[in-house]
Amino acid sequence: MLFRSGYDPYQYVNSIITGTLNVLEYIRKVNALKVIFTQSIADVLHLFGSTDPISPDSVRKFPLIGDHSIYSISKNAAVDLIEHYFNQYAIKRFILRLPTIYVYHPNPYYYVDGVRKWMGYRYLIDRAINGKELEIWGDPFSKKEIVYVKDFVQIVDKCVQSSLDGGIYNVGRGIGVTLEEQIQGIIDVFCPVGVRSKIRYCPEKKDSPQFILDVTKTIEELGYIPNYDYKSYLNDFKKEMQAERFCKLWGRKEDFYL
């Protein structure tokens, strides 16, 4: 579908490409030392479907169709601009390739093709909180990177402190979590005491392609130490959900639920 509700490709180009160029020009003019940029994992989607760790320096591509195409094209162009400014003006660059970064926010929705939908993991958590059945689609042993925001922030801080020229770094743990482990963990952490959601296996339904990121470079060059495994992330997420420490900034969950 070429025309979608709420979808404007110019916004991606203007905010990501032109926006990055504006930042780089500002850095050049004030003689700042470095830029830290978040890159979409869509540039390595062509390597998904395997448990072989994906190198941070893999060939960058972009999906030819779908609502992430223009976004990914714009992100790749921004990375190319950053590399130009590094080589032309010696502006250090730390480009962080991000999978989904899991973080509590009272708004559990996002937009697909301009339409508001539940974020998948938030929908599952909500069902577990209410003791409802959870489904596992496709291969229950398919793995993916699960990264908690507090590990991501550690990497950003390492980039700020680093004296290196930088490069492209994967954000992850280098360890995949299976779909079954994801669902079991959500049940363990979020189901009410004395209640346990049942699991329905749906192998006929489509799952997401598995992937694991190679974080060796992130560890060795930046000194990154992953602190949150899957279960500790869920437990901390639950604490943040209950405390709502940033409610004056973000609002509360009742402000967003339909």
Name what the model sees in each region:
Residues 1-15, 46:
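NAD(P)H-binding glycine-rich loop region in Rossmannoid oxidoreductase-like domains
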Residues 10, 14-21, 33, 68, ...:
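Conserved internal alpha-helix in NAD(P)-dependent oxidoreductase domains
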Residues 19, 23-27, 81-82, 155, ...:
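Hydrophobic positions on the long internal alpha-helix
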Residues 21-70:
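Conserved Rossmann-fold NAD(P)-dependent oxidoreductase catalytic core, especially the SDR/UDP-sugar
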Residues 36-40, 97-99, 172:
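Active-site beta-alpha turn of Rossmann-fold NAD(P)-dependent dehydrogenases/reductases
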Residues 83-143, 149-154, 158, 185-187:
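NAD(P)-dependent short-chain dehydrogenase/reductase
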Residues 128-258:
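C-terminal substrate-binding subdomain of Rossmann-fold SDR/epimerase-dehydratase oxidoreductases
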